[in-house]
Amino acid sequence: MVDNSKIRVVVGMSGGVDSSVSALLLKQQGYDVVGVFMKNWDDTNDDGVCTATEDYEDVKKVADKIGIPYYSINFEKEYWERVFQYFLKEYKAGRTPNPDIMCNTEVKFKSFLEYALDLDADYLAMGHYAKTMVDENGVTHMMRPKDGNKDQTYFLSQLTQEQIKRVMFPLQDLTKPEVRRIAEEAGLVNAKKKDSTGICFIGERNFKHFLSEFLPAQGGDMVTPDGKVVGHHAGLMYYTIGQRQGLGLGSTKESTAPWFVVGKDLEKNQLIVEQGYDSPRLYADRLQASGMTFFTGNPEEDTEFKATAKFRYRQCDVGVTVKYHAASKTADVYFDEPARAVTPGQALVLYNGEECLGGGNIDAAFKDDKKLQLV
């Protein structure tokens, strides 16, 4: 029988209820638990409040309550260099990046995992809603958690086997209401604390104002696909493919249908818009993805297989056929049915039933072998 007291687990504690309950459960299971708070950004919000200071206070209270040591580590340099610069580069190129995935890949499960191992940890534990399973060959698989509504496998989709085999997800068989109930019964100070939203570590700021601090916006024309000017945009980086809100365009004599972003012309600094949800310019039958990573290891040879996919968070899975190219770690992904608003810069995440296979970054979308003018 395994003696859990000889197994050290470093828990990434954010000050939120999920990571706090993760630490509590591991402590109750007898592990040697160490709580660590990561500071990855200057968290002064739009009201001038340093949210990181408040969060760390909650970490200290929870750690004292459950009886574990705690530390704080600063990864602002790593976050700036590996995540934020990528974030700005993608927006500058007209794409819509997902910094949360890069944050997990480069900071939480890389720099932080290395730090945990330096503390002689056997495992790193996080409060994500995800599940791991080890097969008879000792290979770790990423699975969907019990709480499908909180499933975060999408954001973990570019981790490697080396990373996930050292990670524990204590909430994998719990729902969010169950987590809050455990926190309340244990008397944790943050049992009713609201979930954090917004960009990874940047929080709930006014996004347009925040982005303009780092990338000067250049306004330009909103045009229809045939070139008719119908409005003015505040900067291409503020808009994403399929967006309806915030365009400021009304009905026309021809149609009362709402307007949607259907493309961007970077050379002309034009935002391409069209009326109607079902614009054919929004539908793709294929995408190309790069940087493909599979949890169980990348195939060494070209391969073709059926799967389901997400290309945005909380999207229902769609059926696809994947043609993976081993030498370049790229994939051509063919949709069973045309897919709407496939957005370059976002993540492609592949599933086989309950298993998350891995994913990559969307480079381009196509319809009838013609590249869509999305960026």
UniProtKB/Swiss-Prot annotation:
Residues 150-152, 312-313 are annotated as: Interaction with tRNA. Disulfide bonds join C103-C200. Its main location: cytoplasm. It is found in: Cytoplasm. Its EC number is 2.8.1.13. It catalyses: S-sulfanyl-L-cysteinyl-[protein] + uridine(34) in tRNA + AH2 + ATP = 2-thiouridine(34) in tRNA + L-cysteinyl-[protein] + A + AMP + diphosphate + H(+). Catalyzes the 2-thiolation of uridine at the wobble position (U34) of tRNA, leading to the formation of s(2)U34. Belongs to the MnmA/TRMU family. PANTHER family: MITOCHONDRIAL TRNA-SPECIFIC 2-THIOURIDYLASE 1 (PTHR11933:SF5), TRNA 5-METHYLAMINOMETHYL-2-THIOURIDYLATE -METHYLTRANSFERASE (PTHR11933). This is tRNA-specific 2-thiouridylase MnmA. It comes from Lactobacillus delbrueckii subsp. bulgaricus (strain ATCC 11842 / DSM 20081 / BCRC 10696 / JCM 1002 / NBRC 13953 / NCIMB 11778 / NCTC 12712 / WDCM 00102 / Lb 14). The gene is mnmA.
